[in-house]
Amino acid sequence: MASNSRSSISPWTFSQNKMFERALAVYDKDTPDRWHNVAKAVGGKTVEEVKRHYDILVEDLINIETGRVPLPNYKTFESNSRSINDFDTRKMKNLKI
């Protein structure tokens, strides 16, 4: 008998999470056999595990969007009177599309 407990499911690796994200972009909600395709793309996870992972992701997004998850207090990084945003802006100027 399968359990819905998170502890009975093996942890997701960084690579599996990335493959999951990519598969969600490829197989949208209208794709036939979406969860089978996503599970196959991820590898090492069942259709049920993939669905549960998606449900947790949606739940997390809802909690963030409704303000139930507090934003971290980021410290301003300054070096030579330039903030991190200045650094990012300089990097973006060299970006070629």
UniProtKB/Swiss-Prot annotation:
Assigned as a member of the MYB-related gene family, I-box-binding-like subfamily. This is Protein RADIALIS-like 6. SUPFAM superfamilies: Homeodomain-like. GO terms for cellular component: nucleus. It comes from the Eukaryota. InterPro entries: Homeodomain-like_sf, RADIALIS-like, SANT/Myb. The keyword Transcription regulation applies. GO terms for molecular function: DNA-binding transcription factor activity. SMART domains: SANT. The gene is RL6. One of its GO terms (biological process) is regulation of DNA-templated transcription. Residues 7-59 form the SANT domain. Expressed in the micropylar endosperm surrounding globular-stage embryos but no expression was detected elsewhere, including floral tissues. Probable transcription factor. It is found in: Nucleus. Keywords: Nucleus, Transcription, Transcription regulation.
